[in-house]
């Protein structure tokens, strides 16, 4: 992708999301995240009316008179954005790729953070950590976050690639790209992407734990075409406030009728031809795709992790607003 094109897209996203933050998200962000934590300020002598539960018994024993611990509300948050930049993020069937939707979501989060004088950081990952930008404040920094997400998109030659070729690249992921085909163990017969561009969510979460000692609000943005990351996710959520954001495309649920497709078994090498025009194939594909998302959401919620589902072809703002309002209702209980 040309640098000129990246700049154009960043400016476009900045204009669109800037208005949305000002008009829609400003109050939602503050009501959900501000004041959700406290930090230690000082120890001072107890005075009548103080909460006895705040007494510091160690200091009281040493000084011979009661002292209390004083806490103040945390006035600054750190928002950590962890964005999956593996090959499947390039897929898009409705004029916008999952990567572009993720970039717009990153912009909404980054601009909401800097508007409230909070820091925002970014980690880009696939099977490895691609890039880490430490948390900072300021609009210039927020624009860099958006630019880096977009910069890991399609190359110039790929921008002109027909949609069918994009389907081939997407289906070539080691996990099958699409759950129904992945469970069958099939992939397209010719490899089209380097293996390093698969997704390893556990690697990203372990990296987060190593670089962030203080609690952060972490948005994990991915299509979650991975396995074996649940343990790392639960561990990260104990230390941080982790929010899982699934980015999907409508075609991941409704396979197009593109005729006969030759697939190869990833383990045996056996080639099989599938008729994508078959109503039965498309029906089973849709059912298993929906079941995958429902299962993912159940597992996350059972582990105490909030879940946001963003359709790359639709509004990015609406799911975020719904999440903020859900959090606000829960906070008031």
Model-derived regions: residue spans:
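Exposed, interaction-prone extracellular/peripheral surfaces
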Residues: 1-29, 45-50, 59, 68-104, ...
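A positional/architectural concept
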Residues: 33-37
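N-terminal low-complexity, intrinsically disordered segments
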Residues: 53-63
């Amino acid at each position: 992708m040309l640098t000129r094109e990246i700049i154009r897209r960043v400016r476009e996203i900045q204009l669109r999301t800037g208005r949305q933050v000002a008009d829609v998200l400003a109050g939602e962000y503050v009501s959900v995240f501000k004041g959700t934590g406290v930090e230690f300020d000082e120890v001072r002598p107890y005075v009548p009316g103080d909460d006895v539960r705040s007494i510091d018994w160690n200091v009281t024993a040493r000084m011979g008179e009661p002292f209390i611990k004083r806490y103040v509300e945390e006035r600054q948050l750190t928002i950590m954005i962890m964005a999956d930049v593996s090959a499947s993020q390039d897929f898009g069937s409705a004029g916008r790729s999952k990567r572009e939707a993720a970039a717009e979501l990153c912009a909404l989060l980054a601009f909401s953070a800097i508007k409230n004088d909070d820091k925002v950081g970014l980690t880009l990952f696939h099977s490895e950590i691609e890039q880490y930008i430490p948390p900072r404040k300021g609009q210039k920094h927020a624009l860099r976050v958006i630019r880096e997400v977009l910069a890991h998109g399609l190359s110039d030659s790929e921008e002109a690639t027909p949609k069918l070729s994009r389907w081939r690249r997407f289906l070539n992921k080691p996990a099958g790209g699409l759950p129904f085909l992945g469970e069958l163990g099939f992939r397209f017969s010719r490899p089209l992407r380097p293996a390093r561009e698969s997704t390893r969510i556990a690697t990203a979460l372990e990296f987060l734990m190593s670089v962030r000692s203080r609690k952060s609000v972490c948005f994990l943005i991915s299509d979650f075409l991975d396995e074996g990351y649940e343990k790392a996710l639960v561990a990260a959520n104990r230390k941080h406030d982790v929010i899982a954001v699934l980015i999907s495309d409508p075609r991941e649920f409704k396979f197009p009728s593109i005729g006969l497709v030759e697939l190869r078994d990833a383990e045996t090498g056996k080639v099989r031809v599938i008729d994508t025009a078959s109503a039965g194939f498309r029906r089973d594909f849709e059912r298993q795709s929906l079941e995958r998302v429902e299962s993912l959401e159940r597992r996350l919620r059972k582990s105490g992790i909030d879940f946001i589902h963003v359709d790359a072809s639709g509004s990015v703002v609406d799911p975020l607003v719904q999440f903020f309002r859900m959090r606000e209702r829960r906070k008031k209980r």
